[in-house]
A protein has these predicted regions:
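N-terminal beta-strand motif that seeds the catalytic metal site of vicinal oxygen chelate
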Residues: 1-19, 77-82, 132-134
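Vicinal oxygen chelate
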Residues: 2-3, 44, 94-134
Length: 134
């Protein structure tokens, strides 16, 4: 038997918890699901996502965070990708990002579909992907 897990959530360390909570909930329409204190080392976490918990993002703030800028070229996270239904929805997202003042790449077409990149308040790269024909 082959067991293939599915990605359920991602946890990000952010420099300003409230700024990130506001940004992600406003842009993606996520709900705030839980606020929690870390049991080890202090700090706080806010879980945002779909109300049914089928997909969520954990935003963490650690008291030892010195406000370093995210760097995708270092070992660790490169980017976080979200899927959309098709290229038409990707175009809608391109307009939504522009309307909210979020800088973004142009839509790039690939053999496998299309993508669009942008960054969050901590400069973490996010990607929207539409699989299938362009």
């Amino acid at each position: 038997m082959t067991i293939q897990p599915q990605l359920h959530h991602v946890a990000l360390t952010v420099s300003d918890l409230e700024t990130s909570v506001d940004w992600y909930t406003d842009l993606f329409g996520f709900a705030e699901l839980v606020r929690d204190e870390h049991t080890e080392g202090g700090g706080h976490a806010v879980v945002i996502g779909k109300p049914d918990w089928s997909m969520f993002v954990v935003l963490n703030h650690h008291p030892t965070n010195q406000g370093e800028t995210f760097d995708p070229t270092r070992t660790g996270l490169d980017h976080v990708g979200f899927t959309v239904s098709d290229r038409t929805e990707l175009l809608e997202w391109e307009h939504r990002l522009a309307d909210k003042g979020v800088k973004h790449s142009p839509i790039t077409d690939h053999d496998w579909g299309s993508s669009l990149n942008f960054r969050d308040p901590d400069d973490m790269q996010l990607q929207l992907v539409a699989f299938g024909q362009n």
